[in-house]
């Protein structure tokens, strides 16, 4: 490859702001950057004395540079983020975080439902959040259900009940589905209390409850007064647990940051309306020799500009690490329509939370490094046990079904950092005889390997959860496709052995040779890990498919029972479970249901 002619290239570069993309000889984007002054920034790559080892390595691979001029720095920042997201360049810091952020959702209904929501905000209603993870949302919902027991059931369940459910009996739902238990006004008031609570207006809620308690007491309704008193006490306990301080009543993100030995961790403490919603650790993928400031600023840009994941921009971002924040501050201010500030090393309560975030970042990084070392050591042990020069990628397949029903196959992927969950796949198996595991394995492998694979996606080992029969079938399929592969994977079956005990697995080669490893072998532990991941991934997929089928009411398959009669049956008897318990006489009392049809319905439900 002829060297890149930087002098000729720089003659045509402008001094305006913009974004540049660097390509290697294979026309792959290897780096994306932005600049206030494109000419000045790009010239810096071709100086004789480049201090950064990473930049030196990057420059040796440049074959072409494309430039996009923008009107403002903010436009350049957003375009840079979009290009990084699109191309995932080798020399950029990459935020490995493709999960959407969950919200608490209150539906737009006569009797609103409260639930967890992920993804696009299409439903009509109110969204509160986002929360850093689903665990934080579940904790909040559990708490809300204790304080303000509004319904969490699906609208279809709500519409088909006329008896209170178990949640009402244990005091976790006000049962708006049943007339006469709670008035529309009282239910609406509890819903409004939730809105205020989620907005951080706890004192307003407590003040309103205190007034109600005093009113009930003056009216000599002591039972109601005692119920409200208990609700107030619960609210005050929650305040003690969640309250930060008046000075932190803004929306804050507190970021702890640490980097050691090529690993970085940013720990996010999310505070909204003066309450800690939760925290989360991020481990961006960083090229070797990357400067600390580039790691941190790249993370912030990718994290806050990634609108598709449902993130919100806080009023203030607090950090202990100093970096050039002016451009990002300006971009976030323009995007959010309000002033966004980055604050360095504050005092008081904010300082205490910053110290906590830094401590958590260090702790999470240490844990990650230890885990990475353990996985690496297991890979090395496995290479030695199987006499392989290097293992970069492994895939494992498993099949799950119940008596041949809803067969699902799974494929899980491991590399030298452990499970690569973003590459896990499930395959719904169709067109085979129920229970034919050999045919199921053949189908999933055909679907997996019949397509053209990138070199780095070709596994070094393919594990099959099964014995000789499964392994031979797998070999017959895979060998049809590996003709043009630069390497051929080792195929291994994982048989459970005679006793079927964990730690006594038998490994099977395609030659028919069987061998085992000591139960305390790190190599065996790695094999067990990938096998268990594949097994669990297949089972969870199968259960979801099976539940989907069984959730479809048996009533849909009974001749003579159309949508109107189905709705009448469910409404009159209070749901499918109550209908299953009902006698023929009770079923025949439903409007439009004759005795003969009632008998047919009961028979069908017993068989279902």
Swiss-Prot record:
Q: Which GO terms describe its cellular component?
A: cytoplasm; excinuclease repair complex
* Domain GIY-YIG: from-to ranges: 15-93
Where does the record say this protein resides?
A: Cytoplasm
What Gene Ontology terms describe what this protein does at the molecular function level? DNA binding; excinuclease ABC activity
Q: Does the keyword Protease apply?
A: no
Show the CDD domains listed in the entry.
GIY-YIG_UvrC_Cho (cd10434)
Q: How does it assemble?
A: Interacts with UvrB in an incision complex.
**NCBIfam families, alphabetized:** PRK00558.1-5, uvrC
| Descriptive protein name | UvrABC system protein C
Organismal lineage: Bacteria, Pseudomonadati, Pseudomonadota, Gammaproteobacteria, Vibrionales
Q: Which gene encodes it?
A: uvrC
């Amino acid at each position: 490859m002829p060297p890149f002619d930087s002098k000729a290239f720089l003659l045509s570069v402008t001094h305006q702001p913009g974004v540049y993309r660097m390509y290697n000889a294979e026309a792959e984007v290897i780096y994306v950057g932005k600049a206030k002054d494109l000419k000045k920034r790009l010239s810096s790559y071709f100086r004789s004395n480049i201090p950064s080892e990473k930049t030196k390595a990057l420059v040796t691979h440049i074959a072409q540079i494309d430039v996009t001029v923008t009107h403002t720095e903010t436009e350049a920042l957003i375009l840079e983020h979009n290009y990084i997201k699109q191309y995932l360049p080798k020399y950029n810091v990459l935020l490995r975080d493709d999960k959407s952020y969950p919200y608490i959702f209150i539906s737009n209904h006569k009797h609103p439902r409260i639930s967890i929501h992920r993804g696009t905000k299409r439903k009509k209603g109110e969204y509160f959040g986002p929360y850093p993870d689903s665990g934080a949302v579940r904790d909040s919902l559990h708490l809300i259900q204790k304080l303000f027991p509004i319904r969490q059931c699906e609208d279809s369940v709500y519409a088909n009940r006329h008896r209170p459910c178990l949640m009402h009996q244990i005091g976790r739902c006000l049962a708006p589905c049943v007339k006469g238990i709670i008035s529309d006004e009282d239910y609406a008031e509890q819903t409004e209390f939730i809105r205020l609570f989620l907005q951080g207006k706890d004192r307003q809620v407590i003040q309103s409850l205190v007034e109600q308690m005093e009113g009930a007491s003056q009216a000599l309704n002591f039972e109601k007064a005692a119920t409200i008193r208990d609700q107030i006490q619960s609210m005050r306990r929650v305040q003690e647990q969640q309250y930060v301080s008046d000075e932190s009543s803004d929306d804050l993100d507190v970021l702890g940051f640490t980097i050691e030995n090529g690993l970085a961790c940013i720990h996010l403490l999310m505070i909204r309306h003066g309450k800690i919603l939760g925290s989360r650790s991020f481990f961006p993928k960083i090229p070797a020799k990357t400067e600390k400031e580039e790691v941190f600023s790249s993370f912030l840009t990718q994290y806050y500009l990634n609108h598709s994941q449902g993130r919100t921009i806080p009023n203030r971002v607090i950090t202990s690490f100093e970096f050039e924040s002016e451009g990002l501050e300006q971009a976030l201010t323009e995007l959010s329509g309000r002033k966004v500030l980055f604050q360095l090393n504050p005092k008081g309560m904010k300082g205490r939370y910053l110290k906590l975030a830094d401590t958590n970042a260090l702790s999470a990084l240490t844990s990650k490094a230890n885990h990475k070392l353990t996985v690496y050591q297991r890979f090395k042990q496995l290479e030695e046990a199987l006499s392989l020069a290097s293992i970069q990628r492994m895939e494992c397949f498993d099949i799950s079904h119940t008596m041949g029903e809803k067969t699902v196959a799974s494929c899980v992927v491991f590399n030298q950092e452990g499970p690569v969950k973003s590459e896990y796949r499930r395959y719904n198996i169709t067109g085979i005889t129920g229970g034919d595991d050999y045919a199921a394995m053949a189908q999933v492998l055909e679907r997996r390997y019949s397509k053209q694979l990138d070199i780095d996606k070709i596994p070094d080992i393919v594990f099959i959860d099964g014995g000789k029969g499964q392994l031979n079938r797998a070999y017959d399929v895979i060998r049809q496709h590996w003709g043009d592969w630069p390497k051929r994977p080792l195929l291994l079956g994982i048989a459970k052995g005679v006793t079927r005990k964990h730690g006594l697995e038998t490994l099977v080669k395609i030659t028919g040779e069987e061998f085992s490893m000591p139960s305390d072998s790190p190599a065996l532990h790695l094999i067990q890990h990938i096998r268990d991941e594949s097994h669990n991934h297949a089972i969870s997929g199968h259960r979801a498919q099976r539940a989907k089928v069984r959730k479809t009411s048996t009533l849909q398959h009974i001749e003579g029972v159309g949508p109107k009669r189905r709705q009448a049956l469910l409404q009159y008897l209070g749901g499918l479970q109550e209908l299953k318990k009902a006698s023929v006489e009770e079923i025949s009392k439903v409007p439009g249901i004759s005795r003969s049809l009632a008998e047919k319905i009961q028979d069908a439900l017993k068989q279902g």
